[in-house]
Amino acid sequence: MTQQANQTVATISAEALRQSARNIAAAAPKEGDAWRVDDVAALFALPFNDLLFRAQQVHREHFDANTVQLSTLLSIKTGGCEEDCGYCPQSAHHDAGVKAEKLMDLEAVLDAAKAAKANGATRFCMGAAWREPKERHLEPVIDMVREVKAMGLETCVTLGMLKAEQAQRLKDAGLDYYNHNLDTSPEFYGKIITTRTYQDRLDTIGHVREAGINVCCGGIVGMGEAREARAGLIAQLANMDPYPESVPINNLVQVEGTPLAGTEALDPFEFVRTIAVARITMPRAMVRLSAGREAMDEALQALCFMAGANSIFYGEKLLTTGNPQADRDRALLARLDIRAEGYAG
């Protein structure tokens, strides 16, 4: 009798918690109001089906739910970075087998952009492993932006921290997006990186916004953080004024030789929840299913699309880590009857 009573109490308590989560989520702030971390955590706590249903509703209000954008990311300068980001094999602080390379020349970048466009990408991102770009590096990157944009591709670069005048020069060159991720919540951040402050990141995003460039800003999950840190990251992003136009959500790719190698993997459904919460809190953003996709099976990727992801990075590599082959992506999208934006291929 006592055991049955305990089971009943446990059942009632669990149901009460679920109902509480529903009530809090229903009372979440209207768009434009601030998201408290508790509000975001309440979304994470919803039953999985309820969360995905709500995310899909929000997604359909702002996007065609059966269309995704294909993006390609090219490392234009690999390795030798001064930062000590615990997840990154390009850091000079870690022995991950990535050799420092010079900045690619313009023609090689343009060849890669042409190939990306031919394969259906409408967005071309260029990443350089710098703490911040030096003057001698910025002008070649500006040339890359101009030439890639002239091909009709949406352009994005990620070069590290930017000064206000550097952001303005990139804007003048026609840059569409600048990527600078927050990585995680302010509270967990110090466990991942020590060479750049959270405020440094926010300052760069501010310079990008002031220059009139679209902001691409997201984070990485699966770095050993608690759900509260994931909620804190989403709250930080959603409370930007305005929130980012582009929100990449990365699942940690563990690389031998980096401090985060061996971290316990994130529950796959928790990753889907993160996508869904990003969609609900930032309804008009492009939510990009980014690093870590190579380790995801097709069913998990399909759930991410259901949760509101509407962009994938397309091509064999994301900077230095693996990514699904393009033909696998095309086959998956075809099976799901999902169209690639602007591509009839």
From Swiss-Prot:
GO terms for molecular function: 2 iron, 2 sulfur cluster binding; 4 iron, 4 sulfur cluster binding; biotin synthase activity; iron ion binding. GO terms for biological process: biotin biosynthetic process. [2Fe-2S] cluster binds at residues 125, 156, 216, 288. Belongs to the radical SAM superfamily. Biotin synthase family. Its EC number is 2.8.1.6. Its cofactor is [4Fe-4S] cluster; [2Fe-2S] cluster. InterPro entries: Aldolase_TIM (IPR013785), BATS_dom (IPR010722), Biotin_synth/BioAB (IPR002684), Biotin_synthase (IPR024177), Elp3/MiaA/NifB-like_rSAM (IPR006638), rSAM (IPR007197). Binds 1 [4Fe-4S] cluster. The cluster is coordinated with 3 cysteines and an exchangeable S-adenosyl-L-methionine. It catalyses: (4R,5S)-dethiobiotin + (sulfur carrier)-SH + 2 reduced [2Fe-2S]-[ferredoxin] + 2 S-adenosyl-L-methionine = (sulfur carrier)-H + biotin + 2 5'-deoxyadenosine + 2 L-methionine + 2 oxidized [2Fe-2S]-[ferredoxin]. Keywords: 2Fe-2S, 4Fe-4S, Biotin biosynthesis, Iron, Iron-sulfur, Metal-binding, S-adenosyl-L-methionine, Transferase. It comes from Cupriavidus metallidurans (strain ATCC 43123 / DSM 2839 / NBRC 102507 / CH34). [4Fe-4S] cluster binds at residues 81, 85, 88. Pathway: Cofactor biosynthesis; biotin biosynthesis; biotin from 7,8-diaminononanoate: step 2/2. CDD domains: Radical_SAM. Gene3D superfamilies: Aldolase class I. This is Biotin synthase. It holds the Pfam family BATS. Residues 66-293 form the Radical SAM core domain.
